[in-house]
């Protein structure tokens, strides 16, 4: 068998790396001189230290071999403590391989350990167990399974370069306190906890390599070690599980994934609940839930509309906001029946809308959409039933606004006392900026579209209405007097129409007679006024319309 102690310095370094023990400087000098003398030292680690190390089992070799080197309380074999001495032959070579080649039977007792005479070749059969002292290597046992290639497998383990690299890596892992318990064990790639063979040889130590350990003490140490090994194994399993859980949680947080449940290597991602706040879906067709207000809105897609400059055909028609989902669904049904007829798909049966179908026959699509909006329970931007109208949060008055007209910003139209006035202001602005296709709160036939489009300013609701040519007189008495003037001079012609009065009149003048100016009024009257009542009539009929301030400012 090849000796592990060669004269080459490289072999010395490899041997120390393989077996995991260190040689002092004096020892290396002795090896360099070619000497075969060795000074041994006992291990400074106590039994408590060795029992605190982690031991499960490290099986070395291929799958066909049952050979194993164990550190623990396995009755079949194992290493129970660090070797405090290296057995040498008479020529100075290691005899570890020769000791490992020996095999024992399955019923071999723990007290039949190798003796000193076995290593020095002076063993006698009549030597008593009490007289012979156990070597500190007495805890080295052999596997009960006898295989002819045991020596070869073990020798390949110490000579295989990948195994040496693995041993070096495990020693590096042993320095990490987070992976080891007290720094006394390492985690191997085989899934087992293994302990490297750490042997120390010090030149200053004496040759007291023989210890007087007895069988009773060995049994106690074995029981104590097995209990510690079981506790440490359970703690390591919990630590590894916690480490995996923390790693998975950190990975999920980094990727921003939802909570997952691991079931047999499969990840099941939970979907969001249907009742969660903020969703925009509904069980009814054409109904969405507003993510901010929580109110339900009804929309209809009009695919018959084609806007210039847009490749997509159609537009979304807003039908109003509702506090209940069923109301929004019914609004969609009515609009769909108006647009597409009774053959369209509705949320509820068309038989429930017989009365509404008769009413919508006299309205256009835009008129009926405006009718549905006015019946809604409120828009998303305020509590008004009219489009573009909101209520001021401080003084409670109604404000009118229109969006996406002045540089894609909201245009403030003013503050009004009633919702209707604010709604009219919105309608006028919508017609002014969007033409005849504008969606208005009231029927578009209510307004003079040509006049609104030709005006340079936004007209008020009164001026924007159709048939608004009469003078508004707020005083009832003045209105009665004006009617009397018109009726009194309706059958008389004006002799000199070129001399009509053209001064602006704010109010109508009452009928003039002689009683108003006295008895001498008729004689002193100017000759060019033959019929003052007729002239007053002409004045009243030819009064120019007073200019009305069309723009309104914020109050």
UniProtKB/Swiss-Prot annotation:
Entry's localization field: Nucleus
Any one of the GO BP annotations: regulation of cell population proliferation
Effect noted on mutating residue 303 to D: Loss of activation of transcription
Effect of residue 319 to P: Loss of activation of transcription
A GO molecular function held by the record: DNA binding
Effect listed in the UniProt record for changing residue 317 to D: No effect on DNA-binding but reduced activation of transcription
Coiled-coil segments on the chain, per record: none
DNA-binding region: 283-349, 385-443
UniProt xrefs under InterPro entries: AP2/ERF_dom, AP2/ERF_dom_sf, DNA-bd_dom_sf
Effect of residue 333 to G: Reduced DNA-binding and loss of activation of transcription
Effect of residue 314 to R: Loss of activation of transcription
Annotated effect of mutating residue 382 to D: In ant-2; female-sterile, loss of ovule integuments initiation, impaired female gametophyte development, abnormal floral organs, and loss of activation of transcription
Pfam family for this entry, one: AP2
One GO location term (cellular component): nucleus
Mutagenesis or variant effect for residue 337 to P: Reduced DNA-binding and loss of activation of transcription
Outcome (variant: residue 427 to G): Reduced DNA-binding and loss of activation of transcription
Keyword terms of this UniProt record: Activator, Developmental protein, Differentiation, DNA-binding, Flowering, Nucleus, Repeat, Transcription, Transcription regulation
SMART domains associated with the record: AP2 (SM00380)
Gene3D superfamilies from the UniProt entry: AP2/ERF domain
Composition bias, Low complexity: 41-53, 199-208, 218-231
Outcome, altering residue 422 to T: In ant-8; abnormal floral organs and ovule development
Region (Disordered): 34-56, 199-231
Tissue localization of expression: Mostly expressed in developing flowers. Also present in mature flowers, siliques and seedlings, but not in mature roots, leaves and stems. Expressed in ovules and in vegetative and floral primordia.
Subunit composition and interactions: Interacts with ANL2, HDG2 and HDG10, and possibly with GL2, HDG3, HDG8, ATML1 and PDF2.
Membership in a protein family: Belongs to the AP2/ERF transcription factor family. AP2 subfamily.
Name of the protein described by the UniProt record: AP2-like ethylene-responsive transcription factor ANT
Protein's organism: Arabidopsis thaliana (Mouse-ear cress)
Gene field: ANT
